[in-house]
C-alpha cells in the first residue's frame, strides 16, 4: 500500500528514468533545424569530429545528443525515415546498459542504429546480435547505407565463413551476427594454434535483439565444440528394440500407490523412472539379448553404459514426439526449437539422446561427441564490457535480467497509443470443443474481412488445426518448421483481408505483419519497377490497409497458453502495431498440457460441478487466476533451474577464463623458454623430492627408483649412484642442482642441433597441445562430477560447495599435470634436422586446418548442449584407458608413458 502511494507521488523508477531521458530528447529536437542545414559532406564529417573529441577525453554521454541528431538526420537523407522521439528514448536506454522493452512495430531495428553508431565511435567494435542468420543479413544490409554514409564500416558474421572473412567482419566498426556464431567464434579463438587464426577482437559492446529469446530461453543451452566418441550405434539399435515391450503407468510407485506398469513419466521435470517391475523386466530382456550377464544388476558399475542407453531410449520413446520436439527430414532427425517452432539444423541433443531418437526413427545413427570447449550464453555475454538488449516483451522477466545480468528493464512507451482489444480467455472441457470454437471464430472474423493469425505451440497442433480448417473449407497458410523457407512470404501476406495464417509459437518473429499485406514484397517481385508502378502498388495497398483496419485489424487466436506469459504476450504483440486496430483471444481446454500438468485438479472438478454442456465455454476469474498461477509456477521453476545452472557454470567459468587467458598469453609471445625453464625447476624438484625427501637421511633415499624415473619420464640417464659413491659429501641440495644442470645441458644440445627459433616454436606448440588435451580431459571430469554431485545432499553436504571444492582440487591437479607433461614431452623428444622439424610443424598445421573445415555446429536443447562436431580428438566411451592405467599393450608401463604418450 505504502509503495503504491510513493509511486503515485514520485512515479516509478521507469517513469523517473524516462523523464530524465525526455530532457535529452528535447535537446536533440532543438538541434534538428541546425543539422538539417548541414551539407552531406558536413554531416559525414561529424564522425571524424566526434572521434577526435573522444580522443581528447570527452565522454560518450557528452557526445550522445549530437551523435543521435547526426544519425537521425542521416536516416532522413538515406532512408527517408525519421527517428521518432520514442526511438531516441529507446536508443538512450540501450546506451545505458539496459533492456529496452519496445512493442512490435515500434522500429527496434532503426532504434538500434543510434547506440550502435555512438559506441562504434570508440573504434573498439559493436556486435549487434540477432536470433537467426536471415535477420543478421537483413539488418546488416538494410542499415549498411546509413552507416557507410556516416563513414563507418559494417561486417556480417555468418556460419561457414572462412577465418580471413570473419576477421574482416570483426574488424568492422559494427558487426551483425547470431548469438551462436559469436559464441562459437569465441571458443574457436581459444582453440587456435597461432594469433593469426583468431578472428575476434576484445569484446566491447553487444546489442542483443530479441534479448529475452537469447538470454532467457536459451540460457540453459551451452555452446559446445566437441569431437566424436567411439561408435556405439549397434547398442542403440539393440536397446531400442526392447523399449516397446515396457508399459507406461500413470504415476510413480509410492507407499500409497503400486502400479502395474514398467515406467512412469514426470512431465514437469521431463524425466522417466523405471519401476521395480520395469527394472526386473528390462534386466531379463537385456540378458536374453546377450547385452548383460544373467543375474547381473543394471545398476552395477560394469553396466553404467548400458543403463545410460536404456535411460536415453526410454526418454526418446516416452518424452520426445515426432513433429512436436523434432521432425525427420531426408533421413535425419532435426530438433524443433520449443520457443520459436523453427527447426535447428545441425543441432543435436547430448547424453546419447539424439542417437536414441535416431534409433527410434530408424534413421542412420551418428556418433556421440566429447566436449573440447564449452560456454553458456549467460557467461559468454557477461564477457562484454557493455551489454544491452531490446525486445517486445521483457517486463515479466525484469527480475531475472537484473539478478543475473545486472541489466535494468525500461519499458519504452509506444509512438501511438495501443488500442488492441485483448479479449478474456475461453476455457472448454475438451480439445475437440475448443478447436470447433476456434474454427467458428475464424469463420466469423474472415467473413467480415479481418485477417487472422492462429498461434500453436507445436507443429503437431498446427497441423491438427490446419486439417480441421481444410475440412471446414477455410483457405489458410501454415507457417511452421516444415515450411521454414516460405516464412518471409507467408508473413508478408498474413495481413491481407480475410487471410488465415497458422504459426507455431513465434515463427516469423522479427518480421512485422502489415495490414493489407506488404507492398514492399509486391515491388520486390518486379524487375526494375517504374515510379508509376510503385505509386500504383502503394495506392492499392493503402486501400486494402484501410479496409482491413475498418474490419477490426489483425485478430490473434492462441490455441493454448504457453508455459511463459512472455511468449503469450509475444503472440498478442503481433497485432496492434503502431496504434493499429486489432484483437486477441486465447482458447483453452482442460486437456492442454499446461492445464493438465500445472493447473490444480480443483479447477477441473469445479468445471464439472458447474454442469457445463458440450461446446460450452467458461469465463471465470477463478479459472483465469488458476492459469496465471500455473504460468507463474512454471516461470519460477525455470528461473530456479537457470539460476542453479549459472551457479554451477560460474565455477567452470572462472577456470575457463584462467585457462583461456593463459592460452592467449602463450599465443601472443614468441618465446616461452623462460616459462619452460621455470616449470622445469618445479617438475624436477617435485620428482626428486618423491625419491629423496627434503632434509632426510641417506638411508631413506630411493636412488634406483629416481634413476629409473628420470629415464622413463625424461629420457635422462644419469649415474646418480656412481656420483654418490665417488663423492660421499654430495648432499641432497647439490645433487638436486646437478640433476637439473644435466637436464638443462642435454636440452641445450638438442636446441643447438635444431636451432633456437625452431626450438622456441616447438616449445610453444607442445605447451598449447598439452594444455588443450588436459583441458579437454578436465571438462569431461567436471561433467562427470556435476552429474553425480547432487547425491552429496544425502550425506548432509551442500552439493554446490562440494562441487566448488572438488573442481578446484581437480583444476589444481590439472595445472600440475600440465607442467609435468610439457617437460616430459620436451625432454623425450627425438632431435631431428631443422628441415624435418619444419616439415612436422607444417604437417600439424595442415591437419589443424583440415579439422577446422570439418567443424559443424549444433546445439543441445534443455538439458544438453550446443555442439560443434570436429574430428580433432578421438574421445572414448565407457571403458576408456585412463592416462595412469597400465597400457593395454602389456608392457607394464603406464598408458601415458607408452602408447598414450605425446608424440
From Swiss-Prot:
It catalyses: ATP + H2O + cellular proteinSide 1 = ADP + phosphate + cellular proteinSide 2. It is an enzyme of class 7 (translocase). ATP binds at residues 87, 105-109, 512. SMART domains: SecA_DEAD, SecA_PP_bind. It is a peripheral membrane protein. The keyword Hydrolase does not apply. Induction: Repressed under conditions of excess protein secretion capacity and derepressed when protein secretion becomes limiting. This is regulated by SecM. May bind 1 zinc ion per subunit. SUPFAM superfamilies: Helical scaffold and wing domains of SecA, P-loop containing nucleoside triphosphate hydrolases, Pre-protein crosslinking domain of SecA. Its cofactor is Zn(2+). One of its GO terms (biological process) is intracellular protein transmembrane transport. Keywords: ATP-binding, Cell inner membrane, Cell membrane, Cytoplasm, Membrane, Metal-binding, Nucleotide-binding, Protein transport, Translocase, Translocation, Transport, Zinc. One of its GO terms (molecular function) is metal ion binding. It comes from the Bacteria. InterPro entries: Helicase_ATP-bd (IPR014001), Helicase_C-like (IPR001650), P-loop_NTPase (IPR027417), SEC_C_motif (IPR004027), SecA (IPR000185), SecA_CS (IPR020937), SecA_DEAD (IPR011115), SecA_motor_DEAD (IPR014018). It is found in: Cell inner membrane; Cytoplasm. GO terms for cellular component: cell envelope Sec protein transport complex; cytosol; plasma membrane. The keyword Metal-binding applies. Zn(2+) binds at residues 887, 889, 898-899. Part of the Sec protein translocase complex. Interacts with the SecYEG preprotein conducting channel. Has a central role in coupling the hydrolysis of ATP to the transfer of proteins into and across the cell membrane, serving both as a receptor for the preprotein-SecB complex and as an ATP-driven molecular motor driving the stepwise translocation of polypeptide chains across the membrane. Monomer and homodimer. Part of the essential Sec protein translocation apparatus which comprises SecA, SecYEG and auxiliary proteins SecDF-YajC and YidC. Belongs to the SecA family. This is Protein translocase subunit SecA. The lineage of its organism: Bacteria, Pseudomonadati, Pseudomonadota, Gammaproteobacteria, Enterobacterales.
Amino acid at each position: 500500500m505504502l509503495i503504491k502511494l510513493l509511486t503515485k507521488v514520485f512515479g516509478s523508477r521507469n517513469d523517473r528514468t524516462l523523464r530524465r531521458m525526455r530532457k535529452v530528447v528535447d535537446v536533440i529536437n532543438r538541434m534538428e533545424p541546425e543539422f538539417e542545414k548541414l551539407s552531406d559532406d558536413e554531416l559525414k564529417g561529424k564522425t571524424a569530429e566526434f572521434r577526435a573529441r573522444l580522443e581528447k577525453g570527452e565522454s560518450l554521454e557528452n557526445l550522445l545528443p549530437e551523435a543521435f541528431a547526426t544519425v537521425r538526420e542521416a536516416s532522413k537523407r538515406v532512408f527517408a525515415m525519421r527517428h521518432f522521439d520514442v526511438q531516441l528514448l529507446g536508443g538512450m536506454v540501450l546506451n545505458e546498459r539496459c533492456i529496452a522493452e519496445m512493442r512490435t512495430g515500434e522500429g527496434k531495428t532503426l532504434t538500434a542504429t543510434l547506440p550502435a553508431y555512438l559506441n562504434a565511435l570508440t573504434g573498439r567494435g559493436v556486435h549487434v546480435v540477432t536470433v537467426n542468420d536471415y535477420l543478421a543479413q537483413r539488418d546488416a544490409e538494410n542499415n549498411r547505407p546509413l552507416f557507410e554514409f556516416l563513414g563507418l564500416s559494417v561486417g556480417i558474421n555468418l556460419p561457414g565463413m572462412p577465418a580471413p572473412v570473419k576477421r574482416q567482419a570483426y574488424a568492422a566498426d559494427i558487426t551483425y551476427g547470431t548469438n551462436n556464431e559469436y559464441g562459437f567464434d569465441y571458443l574457436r579463438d581459444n582453440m587456435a594454434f597461432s594469433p593469426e587464426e583468431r578472428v575476434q577482437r576484445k569484446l566491447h559492446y553487444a546489442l542483443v535483439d530479441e534479448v529475452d529469446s537469447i538470454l532467457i530461453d536459451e540460457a540453459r543451452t551451452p555452446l559446445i565444440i566437441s569431437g566424436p566418441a567411439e561408435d556405439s550405434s549397434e547398442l542403440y539399435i539393440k536397446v531400442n528394440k526392447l523399449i516397446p515391450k515396457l508399459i507406461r503407468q500413470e504415476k510413480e510407485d509410492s507407499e500409497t500407490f503400486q502400479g502395474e506398469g514398467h515406467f512412469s513419466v514426470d512431465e514437469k521435470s521431463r524425466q522417466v523412472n523405471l519401476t521395480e517391475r520395469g527394472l526386473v523386466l528390462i534386466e531379463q530382456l537385456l540378458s536374453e539379448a546377450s547385452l548383460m550377464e544373467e543375474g547381473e544388476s543394471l545398476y552395477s558399475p560394469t553396466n553404467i553404459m548400458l543403463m545410460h542407453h536404456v535411460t536415453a531410449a526410454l526418454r526418446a520413446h516416452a518424452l520426445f514426439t515426432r513433429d512436436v520436439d523434432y521432425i525427420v527430414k531426408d533421413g535425419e532427425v532435426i530438433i524443433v526449437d520449443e520457443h520459436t517452432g523453427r527447426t535447428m539444423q545441425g543441432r543435436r541433443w547430448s547424453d546419447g539422446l539424439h542417437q536414441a531418437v535416431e534409433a527410434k526413427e530408424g534413421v542412420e545413427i551418428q556418433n556421440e561427441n566429447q566436449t573440447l570447449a564449452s560456454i553458456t550464453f549467460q557467461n559468454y555475454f557477461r564477457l562484454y564490457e557493455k551489454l544491452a538488449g531490446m525486445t517486445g516483451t521483457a517486463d515479466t522477466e525484469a527480475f531475472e535480467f537484473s539478478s543475473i545480468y545486472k541489466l535494468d528493464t525500461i519499458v519504452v512507451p509506444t509512438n501511438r497509443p495501443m488500442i488492441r482489444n485483448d479479449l478474456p480467455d475461453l476455457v472448454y472441457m475438451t480439445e475437440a470443443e475448443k478447436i470447433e470454437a476456434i474454427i467458428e471464430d475464424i469463420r466469423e472474423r474472415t467473413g467480415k474481412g479481418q485477417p487472422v493469425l492462429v498461434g500453436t505451440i507445436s507443429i503437431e497442433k498446427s497441423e491438427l488445426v490446419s486439417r480441421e480448417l481444410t475440412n471446414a473449407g477455410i483457405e489458410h497458410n501454415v507457417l511452421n518448421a516444415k515450411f521454414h523457407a516460405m516464412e518471409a512470404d507467408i508473413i508478408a501476406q498474413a495481413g491481407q483481408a480475410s487471410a488465415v495464417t497458422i504459426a507455431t509459437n513465434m515463427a516469423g518473429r522479427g518480421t512485422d505483419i502489415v495490414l493489407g499485406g506488404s507492398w514492399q514484397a509486391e515491388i520486390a517481385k518486379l524487375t526494375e519497377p517504374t515510379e508509376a508502378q510503385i505509386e500504383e502498388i502503394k495506392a492499392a495497398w493503402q486501400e486494402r490497409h484501410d479496409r482491413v483496419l475498418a474490419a477490426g485489424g489483425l485478430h490473434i487466436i492462441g490455441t493454448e497458453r504457453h508455459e511463459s506469459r512472455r511468449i503469450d504476450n509475444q503472440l498478442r504483440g503481433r497485432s496492434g502495431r503502431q496504434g493499429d486496430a486489432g484483437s486477441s483471444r486465447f482458447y483453452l481446454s482442460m486437456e492442454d498440457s499446461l492445464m493438465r500438468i500445472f493447473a490444480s485438479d480443483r479447477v477441473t472438478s469445479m468445471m464439472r460441478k458447474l454442469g457445463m454442456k458440450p461446446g460450452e465455454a467458461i469465463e471465470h476469474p477463478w479459472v483465469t487466476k488458476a492459469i496465471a498461477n500455473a504460468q507463474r509456477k512454471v516461470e519460477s521453476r525455470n528461473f530456479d533451474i537457470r539460476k542453479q545452472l549459472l551457479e554451477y557454470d560460474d565455477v567452470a567459468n572462472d577456470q575457463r577464463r584462467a585457462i583461456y587467458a593463459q592460452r592467449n598469453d602463450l599465443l601472443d609471445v614468441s618465446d616461452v623458454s623462460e616459462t619452460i625453464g621455470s616449470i622445469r625447476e618445479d617438475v624436477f624438484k617435485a620428482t626428486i623430492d618423491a625419491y629423496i625427501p627434503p632434509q632426510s637421511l641417506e638411508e631413506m633415499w630411493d636412488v634406483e627408483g629416481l634413476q629409473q624415473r628420470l629415464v622413463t619420464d625424461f629420457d635422462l640417464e644419469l649415474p646418480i649412484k656412481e656420483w654418490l659413491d665417488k663423492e660421499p659429501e654430495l648432499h641432497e641440495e647439490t645433487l638436486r642442482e646437478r640433476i637439473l644442470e644435466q637436464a638443462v645441458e642435454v636440452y641445450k644440445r638438442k636446441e643447438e642441433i635444431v636451432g633456437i627459433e625452431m626450438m622456441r616454436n616447438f616449445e610453444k606448440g607442445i605447451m598449447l597441445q598439452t594444455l588443450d588435451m588436459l583441458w579437454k580431459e578436465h571438462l569431461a571430469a567436471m561433467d562427470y562430477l556435476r552429474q553425480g554431485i547432487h547425491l552429496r545432499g544425502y550425506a548432509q553436504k551442500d552439493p554446490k560447495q562440494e562441487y566448488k571444492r572438488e573442481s578446484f582440487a581437480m583444476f589444481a591437479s590439472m595445472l600440475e599435470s600440465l607442467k609435468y607433461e610439457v617437460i616430459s614431452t620436451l625432454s623425450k623428444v627425438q632431435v631431428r634436422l631443422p628441415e624435418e622439424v619444419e616439415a612436422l610443424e607444417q604437417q600439424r598445421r595442415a591437419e589443424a586446418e583440415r579439422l577446422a573445415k570439418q567443424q559443424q555446429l549444433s546445439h543441445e536443447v534443455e538439458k544438453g548442449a550446443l555442439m560443434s562436431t570436429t574430428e580433432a580428438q578421438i574421445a572414448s566411451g565407457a571403458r576408456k584407458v585412463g592416462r595412469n592405467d597400465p597400457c593395454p599393450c602389456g608392457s607394464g608401463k603406464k598408458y601415458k608413458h607408452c602408447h598414450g604418450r605425446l608424440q
